[in-house]
Regions:
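Substrate-binding/catalytic subdomain of NAD(P)-dependent oxidoreductase enzymes
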Residues: 96-146
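Rossmann-fold NAD(P)-binding glycine/threonine-rich loop
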Residues: 23-44
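Conserved active-site and cofactor/substrate-binding residues in soluble primary-metabolism enzymes
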Residues: 28, 51, 55, 67, ...
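Conserved anion/nucleotide-ligand pocket segment
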Residues: 62-116
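Conserved small/polar residues in nucleotide/adenosyl-binding loops
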Residues: 1-5, 144-150
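Active-site-proximal cofactor/substrate-binding loop regions of enzyme domains
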Residues: 18, 41-51, 55-65, 69
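Rossmann-fold NAD(P) dinucleotide-binding segment
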Residues: 4-20
Length: 152
């Protein structure tokens, strides 16, 4: 765990409220971080780490708690969603769709985490941990990357 992540744990240990969008921390150390928040009765909010402006964490924790969720599927990365939409609706090729996403500011300067599936995999690990009430880390999450796909 890096120093930045330790600050979050220290804040929770001190009973402080924490708001984070750090999906790397939550995907790899979520059980420890959420456990510390529970132990110290500290409020840990991380809705921004998953699906941006789409509220999914609170519904998974509260509204869906009594349901039997069997799978979580979807396109949970905005850059990927944009690229796939351009490829399917406009017939744009992958390279041009990625360039346009970058030009519009949807893609990072280094879009590797987006197009290789790491970002989506981390988000799925976080959501799965909550939905299935079990520790799910990034490594076993099934995801498909976009690097050099053919035209849709």
């Amino acid at each position: 765990m890096c120093i930045r992540d330790r600050y979050i744990l220290e804040a929770l240990e001190a009973g402080k409220q924490v708001v984070t969008a750090n999906k790397d921390l939550l995907a790899e150390h979520g059980e420890e971080v959420m456990g510390m928040a529970d132990k110290m009765h500290a409020d840990l909010q991380f809705e921004a780490a998953v699906a941006g402006a789409i509220p999914i964490i609170r519904p998974l924790k509260q509204s869906m708690a009594g349901n039997n969720i069997t799978e979580i599927i979807g396109i949970v990365n905005g850059t990927t969603n944009y690229i796939l939409t351009k490829m399917t609706e406009s017939g744009m090729n992958y390279k041009d769709a990625l360039a346009k996403a970058t030009e519009l500011g949807y893609a990072e300067a280094d879009p590797t985490a987006d197009v290789e599936g790491y970002d989506a995999g981390r988000k799925m690990a976080i959501m799965s941990s909550i939905a299935f009430n079990s520790r799910v880390t990034f490594n076993p999450v099934s995801y498909t990357h976009l690097t050099l796909p053919t035209k849709a």
